[in-house]
Amino acid sequence: MNRGFFNMLGRRPFPAPTAMWRPRRRRQAAPMPARNGLASQIQQLTTAVSALVIGQATRPQPPRPRPPPRQKKQAPKQPPKPKKPKTQEKKKKQPAKPKPGKRQRMALKLEADRLFDVKNEDGDVIGHALAMEGKVMKPLHVKGTIDHPVLSKLKFTKSSAYDMEFAQLPVNMRSEAFTYTSEHPEGFYNWHHGAVQYSGGRFTIPRGVGGRGDSGRPIMDNSGRVVAIVLGGADEGTRTALSVVTWNSKGKTIKTTPEGTEEWSAAPLVTAMCLLGNVSFPCDRPPTCYTREPSRALDILEENVNHEAYDTLLNAILRCGSSGRSKRSVIDDFTLTSPYLGTCSYCHHTVPCFSPVKIEQVWDEADDNTIRIQTSAQFGYDQSGAASANKYRYMSLKQDHTVKEGTMDDIKISTSGPCRRLSYKGYFLLAKCPPGDSVTVSIVSSNSATSCTLARKIKPKFVGREKYDLPPVHGKKIPCTVYDRLKETTAGYITMHRPRPHAYTSYLEESSGKVYAKPPSGKNITYECKCGDYKTGTVSTRTEITGCTAIKQCVAYKSDQTKWVFNSPDLIRHDDHTAQGKLHLPFKLIPSTCMVPVAHAPNVIHGFKHISLQLDTDHLTLLTTRRLGANPEPTTEWIVGKTVRNFTVDRDGLEYIWGNHEPVRVYAQESAPGDPHGWPHEIVQHYYHRHPVYTILAVASATVAMMIGVTVAVLCACKARRECLTPYALAPNAVIPTSLALLCCVRSANAETFTETMSYLWSNSQPFFWVQLCIPLAAFIVLMRCCSCCLPFLSGCRRLPGEGRRLRTCDHCSKCATDTV
């Protein structure tokens, strides 16, 4: 019974016994030989061979002798190879490509079946198309064909406003498409090249990460949903701002395009060609560079100074292609230049002089009291011209006129007070200064002090509508313009040239009736003399000029054709006075936001067709108003302290702006006592205060019409009564029907009159006389009493007549009768 149950479960009812407990089985007898003789012979042969093999395997065998070790063949000695000359360049090691990070792996995995390449006619990938939410989307500026047999034949709908085109995705591909989301809080997101930062409403990536050919790639969150589609990018120094297409919570498409955006379609670029003499070469691959041949490199730049690809040529000249990785911190465009001496109008605030820190120009275009100064010294470079953050170099005033260096702590800037230095590069300084009438740049060291002062009025500046001396810590941010402190940005160009030689008498020495040429240490000078015959020469050591006896017979000058200097009017320029070269002007003026104070909000009191502003501020604050009708009548006033200002408000409205607060608009909503939906006297009272003339005319017209109607009705009633009573008046002792008597107010039968009746009662029964006389008085008293009870009800909603019109706050008087706006 149990066996059948457990067999259903596929196992035995009890575990099988181990081998030691199994019963011994009888050895089966050998099978009887088959009758077939051939099969018997084969079986015997197999048994014999098996016994032979097993016997040899179990038989002990003597050990085999160990083979002798092999002798190593000695390779013939080769003659030593000659050493390669040091001039031969070593092969560069190809840097290993870094493995993709987690974000890149996730993006690559999701893009595998949902992102398609867009290729041009040559088969090059110039962008991408995206399958998302039942549509295939492609940037409009990517001109090419989708690399897919089905998607390439779809008909696309173009939208130039969003720089996108889309088509319906085939049904069999919709299940694998991306999904999008309108939620993108600030943080980091994923795309093909790693992480994308979203902050301040913008997507940014590190500089150099993305580029041409990435147009159409998606930006995804950690769930794989598409947050944005990349269209291009704008270089902003250390980071690149992306131009993207996103969606809001209502599903509406939003395109964000930073200033200076370039489309990232990998269109074929036309190589710009530059010239050197009659030879043309690609501007990005010049035949030499500045570190190899300084003079020739400057010749190339000067010949192509007006070329469209001048910046490309300048970067290539500075960074030699075979010199390995160039370091931006060591080599930049100001490496081509040199400091110089210039004429300063005020040295130590006294007399003009030659100064190593001559101020060429001062710009104060920023809104945050920051100024940009150009001098003849160079900041951020050491004596050799290499970039050094804590050094500056200047032209010495001594006889050798060599370039010397110092630390940036020696540089002082001041106006009416000390300035705070913000940044520096080349000839330029960026500083925040207090207001003043002049700008002074000084070199203050332990040995000497040199300064230069330029008369330039620096006015106090503030942003917004409230004056302040220092920016507040808390307040409101409003748009303003500031100088970009990044040294890589450019605000244009400054013109450069290679100066003509300068002759210095310090290069000549007269001793014992002889004239010697004395060059500075390590420099070459050229002398020209007229001592009978014309003599000239270039020397690097102290050399006697034969035949000359006085210094006035010679001139000696030093010529350096490997450096540019600023095209200053103090220097001897070349003959045509045109710019030979140009360099970038740093510290670009860019739009930004500045923190400004916000004054206390005014206390507003509303009245009939006017408002009162109770203002209180401890600094100058601007109050402006204007009417919103056809005649604005604007007003402006700077206010400080406590004050009250009253303004009239008409139906068109009034707008006022107090300090840096948002504009406020008020309108006159006229009202009056009474109720337009109440009792007749309330209606008349309401419209009488709103439109008195029209109300009087309407009431008068209604009264006249009513009086005419009542008069006509009375006359008609009298005529009808007379016509009804005439037949009965002509018949003696006629009895008038009761209904007609009631209708016409006549007695149905002859009776005594009221006078006769009262006379009779006075003569015969005076108590009844007084009772009869009190009946009308009692009726009059009852009527007056009823009127006194109904009067409070009829006048419950009536306002006092002297209140006048006010700005309404509610529709009915029983709700709130005293509160006004």
From Swiss-Prot:
GO biological process, one term: proteolysis
Catalytic activity entry: Autocatalytic release of the core protein from the N-terminus of the togavirus structural polyprotein by hydrolysis of a -Trp-|-Ser- bond
Domain Peptidase S3: 114-264
Gene3D superfamilies: 1.10.287.2230, Alphavirus E2 glycoprotein, A domain, Alphavirus E2 glycoprotein, domain B, Alphavirus E2 glycoprotein, domain C, Trypsin-like serine proteases
Protein's organism: Sindbis virus (SINV)
Protein name in the entry: Frameshifted structural polyprotein
Free-text comment on this protein's domains from its UniProt entry: Structural polyprotein: As soon as the capsid protein has been autocleaved, an internal uncleaved signal peptide directs the remaining polyprotein to the endoplasmic reticulum.
Listed GO CC annotations: host cell cytoplasm; host cell nucleus; host cell plasma membrane; membrane; T=4 icosahedral viral capsid; viral envelope; virion membrane
Domain of life, per lineage: Viruses
Start-end of Polar residues biased regions: 38-49
Lineage of origin: Viruses, Riboviria, Orthornavirae, Kitrinoviricota, Alsuviricetes
Family assignment from sequence similarity: Belongs to the alphavirus frameshifted structural polyprotein family.
Additional notes on this entry: The strain HRSP sequence is shown.
Region described as Disordered: 1-106
